[in-house]
Amino acid sequence: MHMNKPLQAWRTPLLTLIFVLPLTATGAVKLTLDGMNSTLDNGLLKVRFGADGSAKEVWKGGTNLISRLSGAARDPDKNRSFYLDYYSGGVNEFVPERLEVIKQTPDQVHLAYIDDQNGKLRLEYHLIMTRDVSGLYSYVVAANTGSAPVTVSELRNVYRFDATRLDTLFNSIRRGTPLLYDELEQLPKVQDETWRLPDGSVYSKYDFAGYQRESRYWGVMGNGYGAWMVPASGEYYSGDALKQELLVHQDAIILNYLTGSHFGTPDMVAQPGFEKLYGPWLLYINQGNDRELVADVSRRAEHERASWPYRWLDDARYPRQRATVSGRLRTEAPHATVVLNSSAENFDIQTTGYLFSARTNRDGRFSLSNVPPGEYRLSAYADGGTQIGLLAQQTVRVEGKKTRLGQIDARQPAPLAWAIGQADRRADEFRFGDKPRQYRWQTEVPADLTFEIGKSRERKDWYYAQTQPGSWHILFNTRTPEQPYTLNIAIAAASNNGMTTPASSPQLAVKLNGQLLTTLKYDNDKSIYRGAMQSGRYHEAHIPLPAGALQQGGNRITLELLGGMVMYDAITLTETPQ
């Protein structure tokens, strides 16, 4: 009896050890080549690539996670995974013509599939496997080596997995198990990649879109396995802190849009001589139940962010020298977002450069970490309060390990008569603005409403977007009609009324006491009808109301939607300095 206890005590740990070792044991990274076919294996993960630069097998725990792939019937790539492509007047496949082994040691194997001349862009697709990491690091270098500009609507990596196994999508905010393409394509189609389900509800692949820089990871999971996109930094994505894109969607697809125009970002125009390194990011594979998978990838994401910039990457185009940029923005806004943009484009629609952003504390202080040396344009805008538009903008040079900018004086706000909403380039505070992305919300907004300053409530009486032709009225009183005022309208998004033909573009007639002041017209940012609830492409309008335009006592601003849809950030009436 006493002898059995020690035997039993030893037996359980031994059994546990035997079970765990295959999952955690690691060894040297091995590379096998057969022409342009390659296999990378570190004992935790084994990935075999074909000559076209896409994965043919992904082995984890004895299971090939891409053995059964699926997609839209019309998609020629529905049976491919881990591939790179771009859209420039049509889909352009990445067609590598050579494979380079850049580094091969027991700790790291670094390969690059390179397309020098088969497409409009010169592309390098780099694959890096390291010891002890159950995943594959990747980065892309895109260049225009031609003599004419190249317009690119999207440049992306697509990771497709077995949807019968990894059946759950997770975009870091919401999770779900949507129908697959072969089922969806039998249902009535509402619009682009949007279907009406048998229960009357609507599903769209855009339901699982998200804010790229806010999302630390996104992926697919199920039946004991998870696959995750883990970007250690978002500095190389297009747009700004509010850049949205597709992240995951049905058929177990993980997307990494290096640039994309689904939600207001314009097409990238790569001028001759353009070259940009995107990444690296980690495609991480793990095992466990759903809770364990998410907890594990969350820890992994924190580790990757803490390791940025990666010291193990030796590429002259990847700056490992970085600086911390700090300063203090003197502003009356409760908080502000401070942005550094390396390109000459407006920061919120930039596509060719790198972008860094940080939120000020209540004292106005900010710090941006890991900024490469160089010249940047600094822009700041309110993240709360009522001051619409840029607070400050200037050119800064980043040098050394620390760049201290000192105090930056923000534009002084004009005296405020009233405000609807918070000036933060988002519509969260309005009705439905806190809802998850879903097509239905745009159909539930009234065509006409009346909002009374001082009585109505933003959360209940003002909606995230004006989506139906009609008039929204703002009633307010003034005791000083002789004072000149400015009506400030910040638009968080402006979209067509859908993808039907013909579609109406966003047009908003602005009236004061029944008299037309102006008609605001915008290009289609494609955001609202694709389920965006907080933002798209930002616009602002400042409409002067000359002295005497207002009436003593009651006044009415009318916003008449003539076409398309508009999403509101904030509306204010301010005194015009004399």
UniProtKB/Swiss-Prot annotation:
InterPro entries: Carb-bd-like_fold, Gal_mutarotase_sf_dom, Galactose-bd-like_sf, GH-type_carb-bd, Polysacch_Lyase_4, RG-lyase_II, RG-lyase_III. Its EC number is 4.2.2.23. GO terms for cellular component: extracellular region. Contrary to other proteins secreted by the Out pathway, RhiE contains no disulfide bond. One of its GO terms (molecular function) is rhamnogalacturonan endolyase activity. The keyword Secreted applies. Belongs to the polysaccharide lyase 4 family. GO terms for biological process: carbohydrate metabolic process. The gene is rhiE. Optimum pH is 6.0. Gene3D superfamilies: 2.70.98.10, Carboxypeptidase-like, regulatory domain, Galactose-binding domain-like. This is Rhamnogalacturonate lyase. Its main location: secreted. It is found in: Secreted. Degrades the rhamnogalacturonan I (RG-I) backbone of pectin. Is required for the full virulence of E.chrysanthemi strain 3937 as it is involved in rotting of plant tissue.
